[in-house]
Amino acid sequence: MLDRLAFLQQLPLLLKGTSDDDTPCPGYLYEEFAKISYESVGSCQCLLEYLLNRLQTSSCHVKLKVLKILLSLCFHGSPQFIQDLRRNSAYIQEAAAVSGPPDPLHGISLYQKVRVTAQEIVGNLFSESIPSPSHTVSAKERSQSGMGSQASSAPALHGFGYSQEEKNLGNSKDTFLNGIQRAAVAVTHSVLPGAGLSHTHACERADDAYKPVAIPSTDRRPLPGNSLPTSAHRGCHRSGVPGGGWDESDSGNSSQESPHDKSPLSRSSDVGSKSGSDGQSRNSQRESLDITDRVEFTHLSDCQQEARLVQEVTWGKRVFLTQEESQQFVRGCSLLNCEVVFEMLNCSLTDDSNCIKLRSMCAISSLMASDLLSHEHMLAVVRQNLQTLTGGPPGPVKDKATKILRQFQALTQNFSERGAVHHETSPSPTTHCSLDLFADVIPHSVVSGLLTSLSVPSSPTLNVQNTVCSLPNGAANQKNPNGSTEKSDPAEELRVETGDHISTNIHVSLFEGMELVGTMKCSHKEDTIGYRAGGLSVEPAKEEPSKPTLSSVFSFLNT
């Protein structure tokens, strides 16, 4: 009765191992079932009864799991369980002939596996290869084989591939006594470490004795049998010293070691001690040197990718960057430190090669079009070098630098008058007060000519025409106040003739007297239009100098 109550505690494991699903039985449950068979005779009978009842179910999954458990117990179960299984082998033989309708998913494969496993169990039950009770090791003894320091004759934990070609382990009485002895030794070791050491392993544990932890050295190594002195590795504490006031291990005996046995770090500390400094100054000097080296190494390693990117952009066969190169450069800047890249581009503007300068300025223009850096920051970095380039000789470098400065002026809107670019073609002091962004495209002289009014107001051109028209046609030369003769310009003669021709043939227009502005398209006709207006306004200007009268179809309105 007590065995059955104890068996009920193992029922969850049995239900898990024989569940009706596709999941295989976990491997650790096979060992648990073997332990149940060794607990008592009643537990062994209850286990066999439960497994045979589960074998009678109609599910092939349950049958297959039960047969695999029985096959495992044939090799690792108790002798009592194997003997009872032989008496009830009819259930196994019945499972060896099982068949049924095919499964929708697996077909008849499950039935084949069940039959093969059942036939294997029957063959192992009645064969001579089954280990005898005297050679069988209990599960409790196998579980204690890994605790503490076991004897050399202790059996190893064998799996399914265990072969019988092992030495004789003795009878069950000796095995039981050996298990009790190993358990006692394990308990003694856990309570009193180092007690109960056997003499057989004394020599093996001699080399495993505790040794103080030592820092490995590349130049020298201690002998295997001798342990390092603990005083040489014990640090000395000083209050008020950076780093907690702890000296390194080589600072205490640095004066006693030979120069050949010292590491480079200890040699640097010895040099500091010979110069008259104490241990505190040596530590401070060593820390400062380490920090400097570390900062320099980090700086160089951090800027390598930026320098490589700038080198790829500035060094090329073409003078200007292609669209693909500009996009690739901006994409690379977004992944790296943009400020460092821009400073390197600024340094490239001082190069002697014009190609490098132009490619650098193209890269700067690409960064201006992106939002990686602010325009104020970019202008503050490259302003001086760009102004230097604009003051250089005429050429593409000067034009490109001028264009970039004008772009910065329009983007930042706070560019001072001192930084504005001065034109060589406009020496008047009023031209540099405000800059035109498109001055490079359309010259300033052409723009002023195209925007000339076609109205009647008095102009130098009109006065010259009237003066020339009053002279005879044969007078080609004039006298200056100094008495010298000056030959008239052929263009002026053409302008006079055109004016005379228009004055004789007057055409009335609806748009006379209106303020007209010449268009940008017909720049070659502006002189003709101007002459026509000038010719029409000669005689009315003499009648009323204050208010010129025009010949128009709307003249009747002036009453």
UniProtKB/Swiss-Prot annotation:
Residues 472-485 have a biased composition (Polar residues). InterPro entries: ENTH, ENTH/VHS_tepsin, ENTH_VHS, TEPSIN. One of its GO terms (molecular function) is protein-containing complex binding. Residues 2-135 form the ENTH domain. Its main location: Golgi. May play a role in vesicular trafficking of proteins at the trans-Golgi network. PANTHER family: AP-4 COMPLEX ACCESSORY SUBUNIT TEPSIN. This is AP-4 complex accessory subunit tepsin. The gene is tepsin.
